[in-house]
């Protein structure tokens, strides 16, 4: 554990956050609240797979988002607009409007009976962002190790 964080490390942490924000705009081309909604659905998917004892590497995780098993898992453990709203402390109407745009772009899928799940274009849109973020995070971890 880092006992003290120097200004260079603080700068690196802040730079990581700024880079992530800019990468969302560059790769995904939507606002940050929409991105957090998308990440909430993705996080729900990952948590459900882990709770079933499944574990995937980077490539497998993205491949799994396109399977029937993913769709069934998300139906069985339905995620609602209300749950996303509560999780992100956003008004339900805001979540609903942003969700509509994400669904139109096929990043997410939503129906009242099946709940929220990752859409057909999730992988092709988010995987490049994940790779860019991953590089930044690993570089940040190395700086923490050196501190």
Named regions from a protein language model:
Residues 33, 77-80, 95-98:
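Amphipathic alpha-helical interface surfaces
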Residues 1-40, 44:
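N-terminal leader segment of winged-helix/HTH proteins
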Residues 132-147:
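Amphipathic alpha-helical dimerization/coiled-coil segments
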Residues 89-104:
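Short amphipathic alpha-helical interaction segments
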Residues 76-86, 102:
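A short alpha-helical element within helix-turn-helix/winged-helix DNA-binding domains
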Residues 63-65, 80, 107, 112-135:
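Short, cationic-aromatic polyanion-contact patches
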Residues 37-77:
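Short helix->loop/beta-hairpin flanking segments within DNA-binding domains
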